[in-house]
Amino acid sequence: MKRKISSIFLILAGVSCVAMAAGNKPVSYPDGYRQWQHVKSMIIQQGHPLHGAFGGIHHLYANRAAVAGYAKGTFPDGAVIVFDLLEANEADHAIVEGARKVVGVMHRDAKRWAATGGWGFEGFAGDSATNRVVGGNAATACFECHRPRAADQFVFSRTRP
């Protein structure tokens, strides 16, 4: 019985240490990202397989390190890519931006986030810089979709010539 309790205690202590370590590695909200280089925009409409999670207007932004990564094909540590997702509303025969749904962030640090391809992932709900929607679930919430893009350092987007 003592052995079982000791084993359970060690497992719980290990889980707590892992959780604390993960808590020390949050991806920061990218203040001023809309002043960074705009990479691309797109609209995911009804009928697209990702519409449920990502339907709306997307704008992608890159900091200087990420811009260099797009140019070289290799993203250095410190590269940050922001996925700004807004509702797509129709008005007067035009598709216009509605409320912000989420600000998704990929932050490159090969050592810090080795388990997720060298990228830290986070999503911030709506216009909040503090309401995190990914947290400790980056491996399943984000990286599983990015995993097939290993040859491109797990990045889907490309810059236009």
Where are these regions (language model features)?
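Sequence context surrounding c-type heme c attachment/ligation sites in exported
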Residues: 23-51, 68, 72-161
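Positively charged n-region of N-terminal signal peptides that target proteins for export
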Residues: 1-7
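Sec/Tat signal peptide C-region and signal peptidase I cleavage site
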Residues: 17-23
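Bacterial N-terminal signal peptides
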Residues: 8-17
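Short, structured beta-strand/loop micro-motifs enriched in basic residues and often containing a Trp
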Residues: 55-66
